[in-house]
């Protein structure tokens, strides 16, 4: 509340807030759990990389990892071998992520449109990373039906 008073929410109230882009904590059995998948940009922005907390975390991790892994290559002369090693390194990491079920895809290519002659002469190299972390399972729907025809089969009639 505005005055700082804590409020206990049930699942329905947490879901209502989550539909407005507000993640909450709710009590589940004896523990508190984060309830909600969306970042504060939702529902205005529905781009999965911005809207889902787990996807945003993956993108942040991928970016930080790329920067840290390649920091030592800055200020070194670029050549075909170094360029390919950057791409190969990311793609090997991506293959591991995909084979471990962390994401559906993860690959890097040199951005041929941005790697113009002027950019290359200036020492600016551009890459494009395609990655698809799995979105959260927000809702599960299950329809049940009484199948009376099974009685005939079960009773051998």
Regions from the PLM with identified roles:
Residues 101-123:
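Long, charged, glycine-rich C-terminal linkers/tails
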Residues 1-86, 132-157:
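Long, contiguous, structured domain-core segments that constitute the functional module of a protein
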Residues 62, 108-110, 127-129:
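Generic structural hydrophobic/aromatic packing signal, biased to beta-strands
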Residues 119-136:
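Long, well-structured alpha-helical subdomains associated
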Residues 18, 48, 94, 111-117:
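Residue-level detector of functional hotspots within protein domains
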Residues 84-106:
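Short, hydrophobic/π-rich interface segment
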Residues 87-91, 95, 115, 119, ...:
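Short alpha-helical interface elements
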Residues 5, 13, 104-106, 125-127:
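Structural beta-strand/beta-sheet cores of well-ordered domains, especially the beta-sheet scaffolds
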